Amino acid sequence: MEDEEEEARALLPGGSDEAGRETRAPPAASGALQALCDPSHLAHRLVVLLLMCFLGFGSYFCYDNPAALQIQVKRDMQVNTTKFMLLYAWYSWPNVVLCFFGGFLIDRVFGIRWGTIIFSCFVCIGQVVFALGGIFNAFWLMELGRFVFGIGGESLAVAQNTYAVSWFKGKELNLVFGLQLSMARIGSTVNMNLMGWLYSKVEASLGSAGHTTLGVTLMIGGITCILSLVCALALAYLDQRAERILHKEQGKTGEVIKLTDVKDFSLPLWLIFIICVCYYVAIFPFIGLVKVFFTEKFGFSSQAASAINSVVYVISAPMSPIFGLLVDKTGKNIIWVLCAVVTTLASHIMLAFTLWNPWIAMCLLGLSYSLLACALWPMVAFVVPEHQLGTAYGFMQSIQNLGLAVISIIAGMILDTRGYLFLEVFFIACVSLSLLSVVLLYMVNHAQGGNLNYSAKKREEMKLSHEE
């Protein structure tokens, strides 16, 4: 206890030495170091923020390894598109369940610090097993690796958000979430543009292409997961130290999951779920498969196709915080969701039925993808009571992962049997169903008072009137 008090005193500007004498004012360099070591100081929290951002970098970098190496995986492992897409399906399957229990495990079982470390270990182990599957030419081992990777990936994102809430409050929090999302998109972008180049370098070193080259490339990519694990360990130490010095509680997700709440979900909430699933199944499986489409239809090189494929994430990185601020300032969530879905539909139609430069469609897709996330997910909080938020978001993520798992397999089957045109028509149908759900949501919500489409000013007025 005396050591804790001494450490806390040492961080104060007027800290005293062992004899209780006043110490001299520290020089500028010493003052800066003191600020970095003080958990209550902004400089220290910025260090923590940097670690938080890199905590999920490895997971997002490695998630789309299959998309970046689509040609190489199918050729070296001698699998068709249906089997290739199982690498995405196996990631999603565990998260159909874990979306409900990730927060519970962090709050009640492991705690935020151990939970983050354990989920980071799952991500690392999963990526290593995935790479070993390539080295030993065992596709089933690659599937197992993706399953283990999936167990850690989504739950690690929950832990990342929990740390953010624990260290940052109020308006700071929106910026922190925006920065974390931007870093995630940077991870995906770097993967799309780096892994193909890395494969060619490994191929040159080993003398030939093949499953061994693929496995070694994936193993090198796994270094990013080790970086994330190091960040998890550093965060655990700094969080424990801050708890000891500032006497603050360990961060918790605050989620309360009650599956019985599902029966009370309103029609607008179910429509939001349908919009979410039908929209995202036309984004992530599409990104996983579209690289070969760009080389076959438009004649791009493999590296150029990767660059086009990554533009969705490139745009999302800076635009997500900007669109988040825009939606916060204007309100009108349904209108913004409608704009995002219509733009996405236009992008898929362009890619399917025209020979226009695909950069146009993919840039539009990047903008609409960023806008939808900022406008759709906050709407859940407007249609369910606060005590049901954990269940609602858990259920939304669960059926999203279920949809991604099923549609990934279906998309692979369509591509194997019918080709890219039919696949694009399938994605257009999914987005059209999402668009129909947005229109229905607008009509239902309008009949119930229209709170989802209030302007920001009207929401503030309603909030003030309720407080009075």
UniProtKB/Swiss-Prot annotation:
GO terms for biological process: dipeptide transmembrane transport from lysosomal lumen to cytosol; protein localization to lysosome; protein stabilization. The keyword Nucleotidyltransferase does not apply. A motif (Dileucine internalization motif) lies at residues 11-12. Keywords: Lysosome, Membrane, Transmembrane, Transmembrane helix, Transport. The chain crosses the membrane at residues 42-62, 86-106, 116-136, 138-158, 173-194, 218-238, 270-290, 307-327, 334-354, 364-384, 395-415, 421-441. Gene3D superfamilies: MFS general substrate transporter like domains. It is found in: Lysosome membrane. Pfam families: MFS_1 (PF07690). Residues 1-25 are annotated as: Disordered. GO terms for molecular function: dipeptide uniporter activity; protein homodimerization activity. It is a multi-pass membrane protein. It catalyses: L-alpha-aminoacyl-L-arginine(out) = L-alpha-aminoacyl-L-arginine(in); L-arginyl-L-alpha-amino acid(out) = L-arginyl-L-alpha-amino acid(in); L-arginyl-glycine(out) = L-arginyl-glycine(in); L-alpha-aminoacyl-L-lysine(out) = L-alpha-aminoacyl-L-lysine(in). Signal peptide: none annotated. Its main location: membrane. One of its GO terms (cellular component) is lysosome. Belongs to the major facilitator superfamily. Lysosomal dipeptide uniporter that selectively exports lysine, arginine or histidine-containing dipeptides with a net positive charge from the lysosome lumen into the cytosol. Could play a role in a specific type of protein O-glycosylation indirectly regulating macrophages migration and tissue invasion. Also essential for liver homeostasis. The dileucine internalization motif is required for lysosomal localization. This is Lysosomal dipeptide transporter MFSD1.
